[in-house]
């Protein structure tokens, strides 16, 4: 499948099933804790500066944001998790919204699960990964902010992340940087492989 990534736009924001686009265009969901670099990942992948708004206020994305890419693929930006200043009620609401999408959406082909390469995965990161494995949803694990760590230490950080998550070798692991575009091609290859299956 040839995709013109320049032909991308935000399509709609949805709070529940009734708002999802009604068609069979494949979707890739993007999940990760607040401030992991999800918006930067989307903007880098689509070669745009601010298609996905990078928010200085974590926890701002409270809906599922659907991005249309060339009418052939969609990215679905899932609300960032693990942000402490959001009330328990809000967190529970997000949880239900995310769970409903991930477990019932037939268009979903895989989840890009983003973690910060600099830090050991949080309890929320582990829970998200276990959730995806439990529901047998294909995972592309993307470790962001690779430019913040010397190249010589990448392997050490990668191993620590894989160990903490009990990483399944059948899943894809990609080191990524929105600053120097490390992992850009590998991410597209992994996504298109899932979409074309």
From Swiss-Prot:
Known function: Necessary for normal cell division and for the maintenance of normal septation.
Cofactor(s), names only, from the UniProt record: Mg(2+)
Organism: Streptococcus gordonii (strain Challis / ATCC 35105 / BCRC 15272 / CH1 / DL1 / V288)
CDD domains attached to this UniProt entry: YihA_EngB (cd01876)
Pfam families: MMR_HSR1
GO molecular function: GTP binding; metal ion binding
Residue numbers binding Mg(2+): 39, 61
InterPro entries: G_ENGB_dom, GTP-bd, GTP-bd_ribosome_bio_YsxC, P-loop_NTPase
Family: Belongs to the TRAFAC class TrmE-Era-EngA-EngB-Septin-like GTPase superfamily. EngB GTPase family.
UniProt keyword annotations, A-Z: Cell cycle, Cell division, GTP-binding, Magnesium, Metal-binding, Nucleotide-binding, Septation
Record-annotated EngB-type G domain positions: 24-197
Entry GO CC: cytosol
Protein name in the entry: Probable GTP-binding protein EngB
Gene Ontology process terms (BP): division septum assembly
Binding residue positions for GTP: 32-39, 59-63, 77-80, 144-147, 176-178
Top-level taxonomic group: Bacteria
